[in-house]
Amino acid sequence: MSAKTYPVLKAAKAQALIDNDKYLKWYEESIEEPEKFWSKHGKRIDWFKPYTKAKNTSFKGKVPIKWFEDGLTNVSYNCIDRHLKTHGERTAIIWEGDNPYIDKRITYNQLYDNVCRLANVLKAHGVKKGDRVTIYMPMVPEATYAMLACSRIGAVHSVVFGGFSPEALAGRIVDCESTFVITCDEGVRGGKPVALKENTDVAIDIAAKQYVIVNKVLVVRRTGGKVGWAPGRDLWYHQEIAKVKPDCPPVKMKAEDPLFILYTSGSTGKPKGVLHTTGGYLVYAAMTHEYVFDYKDGEIFWCSADVGWVTGHSYIVYGPLANCATTVMFEGVPNFPDQGRFWEIIDKHKVNIFYTAPTAIRSLMGAGDDFVKRSSRSSLRLLGSVGEPINPEAWEWYYNVVGDQRCPIVDTWWQTETGGILISPLPGATDLKPGSATRPFFGVKPELVDNEGKVLEGAADGNLCLIDSWPGQARTIYGDHNRFVQTYFSTYKGKYFTGDGCRRDEDGYYWITGRVDDVLNVSGHRLGTAEVESALVSHHLVSEAAVVGYPHGIKGQGIYCYVTLMAGHEGNEELRQTLIKHVRSEIGPIASPDKVQFAPGLPKTRSGKIMRRILRKIAEDDFGALGDTSTLADPGVVDDLIANRQNKASA
């Protein structure tokens, strides 16, 4: 735990929307009188029919969560139409291509035209309110148009990260029974093409075998690369939008109508379709965007995430556009053409607020300061971090080298399920401690409990729960509300269990210590160990697999796989590489194993349960305190695992 404290910067305090007194006053009201607080702040978006009650929620029983429930609104209207009178010619999106010489600016007027046309294309091909549309796209403006077009007509979008494999895409199409897919001929990342249309074709064939038939595929031409074509099913985006009108009225949506499904990893193998609804989500995304980033009208905001993750949904698309900000959308990667790319983009587009992940910060820190120093970064006023806890060394580098000691850092903690930021400093209100997410946002009530569920007071180390709802909270898991209740509300009755461990210090600051369930956080992306295990076991030579995380210098957590082969087979380097490739093709490159250890057996209890605690310790090269191994069916396997570990300190 870092002992250093950085007081609120004078310059940040002077112009901040919220100082410490205001934070304390608002926070108290948000906790003591949530109905009054949220009734007031719900008005930050436009409503066709105003709500009469803000909050109607319970974390007990079937966990019904409803916010602003009798109000009518439309997300697309709030992100576009309401800005047109005053700011139609303001840049809504700055698109920076993978190639540093290609960029594009889209005004709010142009955004309106593009979104309305795409909405009309969807309607022309039979997409109705409530239908699920899968978006499998690279970081191009059309991905944003697709999300907003769905929200305009009441269709529910399911964005799938363009780095996922055809198998992963198919699983997500099948789960939400999506019949319309929007994709690209190819994506471009780091100068290399990504075969999105080809992957989509494979995924559609897999889905069809599970009786989910995709009727239409709308294809954006990005590279002009050669693609397969199914006449009658496949449609060119540029041809379709030319046939329709540039106006489409927004559908009046109930606040609790579904807005999107986003799949996230759970501790069991099947990804969960987290469902967010319309009113509460937008209020919360817009409000956190304004106050956490201390956003001022006309500023340029860059979140370097991908729209395939929740961070992209809330802080590239919905939060910034609801606030009439200029949002930067970057197609490429931080190290192409070289490791100075982020800082060059900041100078080129005069970015004021920059929000990225600790993994990127650590890898760019490793490349040395020269790449940073050749840019001025003089437009920067605020830095943010998201996706995983940031280690103090990376925080200090980000603050001192990137921000020149003049930009506050907001280290934000939240999840796919929370819709927006829950714990974070506010730049004009919060003294900073490197590595701490600091204090809860308005309306957020954290609680630490021990493994038995006993509430821990004061400075303590425990499991992080939330004891009351906030507007951005997910409402269910698509098609499986029982799983929603079981996953989040059954471990500690009446509380939302985050799955994260957390320490609270004597100042009441929160320090996230990492996952306490079977979920990995690799480069800020969640991956279920069970997902990786089932990918490994699907290989014909693998009899059993166990996957754990271990500390990784760049990614935060690396993926360590223990593999038992079928009888008569020996592990070797060639097979190790084959298995790594196999996992990549089953899930995608983000799931690429870092270490594969062949093991004759895994440590199991007599009831057959794998003792992951032991595997974690061995993966961490820390087996001095393995605890009680007497319950193991075959204690001898532990010695073999230790002898053949892949992570020896000397290695």
From Swiss-Prot:
Mg(2+) binds at V537, H539, V542. One of its GO terms (cellular component) is cytosol. One of its GO terms (molecular function) is AMP binding. InterPro entries: Ac_CoA_lig (IPR011904), ACAS_N (IPR032387), AMP-bd_C (IPR025110), AMP-bd_C_sf (IPR045851), AMP-binding_CS (IPR020845), AMP-dep_synth/lig_dom (IPR000873), ANL_N_sf (IPR042099). The keyword Kinase does not apply. Its cofactor is Mg(2+). GO terms for biological process: acetyl-CoA biosynthetic process from acetate. It comes from the Bacteria. The modification N6-acetyllysine is found at K609. It is an enzyme of class 6 (ligase). Its EC number is 6.2.1.1. The keyword Nucleus does not apply. Belongs to the ATP-dependent AMP-binding enzyme family. Catalyzes the conversion of acetate into acetyl-CoA (AcCoA), an essential intermediate at the junction of anabolic and catabolic pathways. AcsA undergoes a two-step reaction. In the first half reaction, AcsA combines acetate with ATP to form acetyl-adenylate (AcAMP) intermediate. In the second half reaction, it can then transfer the acetyl group from AcAMP to the sulfhydryl group of CoA, forming the product AcCoA. This is Acetyl-coenzyme A synthetase. The gene is acsA.
